């Protein structure tokens, strides 16, 4: 039963509020135990919430399976990310005269589809490998994190990009989209096209800072997604 969990009874616990005679009988008459479904018990960083994919994978494997989030975190920490041959091939191409490295993806620490620390590690590794121009195309989250948290993530990102620029690498935000458009999974081209045009054609152009763009969106009651 996907989504079933054990927690203290209360008004917000749908399971404890429901009438569950079959489950009550199973718990009363059959052996059972509890499994942790988040954090290090399922191969995620400590304190990181689990999700359905993580639960299915660990139960099916019968052991702790280190998730991509944990593996990439470790690669960032031990330096092996910067030594990845595929990444280094891209960094080498970006180091050529007149070239630029374009990074695109979800900008949040939701931990389901993204970790902004991975973005920072990639940008720093590219700069260390000789890239002189880095452009970040930001897909705002608002689903795995609060719906109006994006402005804070962009402010933090701009701080990292400013550090790289101070070190001699032009690092900047190229476009801002919402995941509703940029990460549509249902083949809705009318959505994806808007994010694609923002990345490829810089349409529509905005003569404003990232903070101004986000503030205008919030003022119009448009959230990050």
Predicted features along the sequence, with ranges:
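Terminal, contiguous helix-loop blocks that mediate binding/assembly
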Residues: 162, 177, 185, 189-225
């Amino acid at each position: 039963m996907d989504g079933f969990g054990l927690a203290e009874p209360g008004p917000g616990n749908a399971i404890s509020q429901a009438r569950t005679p079959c489950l009550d009988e199973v718990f009363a008459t059959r052996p059972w135990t509890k499994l942790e479904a988040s954090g290090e018990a399922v191969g995620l960083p400590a304190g990181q919430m689990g999700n359905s994919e993580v639960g299915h994978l660990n139960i099916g494997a019968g052991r702790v399976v280190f998730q991509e989030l944990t593996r990439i975190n470790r690669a960032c920490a031990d330096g092996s990310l910067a030594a990845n041959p595929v990444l280094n091939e891209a960094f080498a191409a970006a180091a050529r005269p007149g070239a630029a490295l374009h990074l695109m993806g979800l900008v949040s620490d939701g931990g389901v589809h993204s970790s902004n620390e991975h973005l920072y590690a990639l940008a720093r590794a590219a700069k260390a490998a000789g890239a002189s121009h880095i452009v970040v195309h930001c897909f705002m989250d608002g689903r795995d994190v609060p719906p109006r948290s994006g402005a804070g993530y962009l402010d933090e990102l701009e701080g990292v990009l400013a550090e790289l620029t101070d070190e001699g690498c032009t690092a900047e935000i190229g476009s801002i989209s919402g995941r509703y458009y940029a990460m549509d999974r249902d083949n809705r081209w009318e959505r994806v096209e808007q994010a694609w045009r923002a990345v490829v054609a810089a349409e529509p152009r905005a003569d404003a800072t990232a903070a101004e763009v986000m503030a205008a969106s919030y003022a119009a009651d448009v959230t990050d997604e």
